[in-house]
């Protein structure tokens, strides 16, 4: 029973699987709302839609629901969290200030200058927009991969992408083709589920087009794998 205890803030970090499955997040927020309450700021790091967080803010009235988008990958995530250089917190203003003070006191590279506060729906939309931008960048360089081949360039594509990324406005992140997983297009846990959900709630023709184009790029992976396997079988048969 936590009802008699006072918490400065509570942080929630649970998975929200593809399909905007917020079952676990709802369960956790419901229990915190019931058993902790006390108008406690509850900072959620889980990705979900602006609509979800707007509704959560209104539904769980014994707590103050906040959203702070997470930007970690599975590699070195603890170290990356400890060394993050910016942070966004969305929700009721005084609760945001309390949570930002917690972050500043414990994370050495965060200051009041690089922590940004806003409303909860904006914070949620920022995460989706950034992941869509990164996915779109991957899509662009997958298209450039084919254009580079068709134009008869003497450089390798890796040389080409590094040259393109020499302009600091572009950079080389999310330009490797095939990607780190050896496949075309973008995949992974976050880009896949977040851009799928963004397509569903944004009602944007551009988002739908890029997601569908990425599905085409991902399909090439299987075609190339089959071709490589077929070529290998032919070589083995001729040896």
Indicate where each model-derived feature is located.
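Structural/interface elements that position substrates and couple domains in central-metabolism enzymes
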Residues: 1-239
């Amino acid at each position: 029973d936590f009802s008699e205890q006072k918490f400065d803030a509570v942080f929630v970090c649970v998975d929200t699987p593809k399909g905007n499955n917020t079952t676990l997040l709802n369960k956790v927020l419901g229990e915190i709302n019931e058993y902790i309450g006390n108008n406690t700021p509850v900072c959620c790091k889980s990705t979900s839609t602006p609509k979800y967080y707007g509704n959560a803010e209104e539904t769980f009235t014994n707590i103050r629901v906040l959203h702070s988008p997470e930007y970690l990958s599975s590699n070195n995530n603890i170290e990356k969290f400890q060394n993050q250089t910016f942070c966004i917190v969305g929700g009721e203003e005084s609760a945001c200030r309390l949570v930002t003070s917690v972050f500043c006191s414990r994370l050495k590279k965060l200051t009041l200058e690089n922590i940004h506060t806003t409303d909860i729906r904006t914070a949620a939309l920022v995460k989706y927009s950034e992941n869509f931008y990164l996915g779109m960048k991957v899509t662009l360089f997958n298209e450039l991969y084919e254009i580079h081949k068709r134009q008869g360039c003497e450089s390798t594509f890796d040389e080409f992408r590094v040259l393109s990324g020499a302009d600091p406005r572009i950079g080389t992140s999310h330009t490797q083709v095939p990607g780190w997983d050896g496949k075309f297009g973008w995949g992974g846990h976050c880009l896949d589920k977040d851009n799928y959900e963004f397509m569903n709630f944004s009602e944007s023709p551009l988002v739908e087009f890029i997601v569908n184009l990425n599905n085409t790029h991902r399909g090439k992976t299987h075609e190339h794998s089959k071709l490589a396997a077929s070529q290998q079988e032919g070589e083995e048969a001729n040896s």
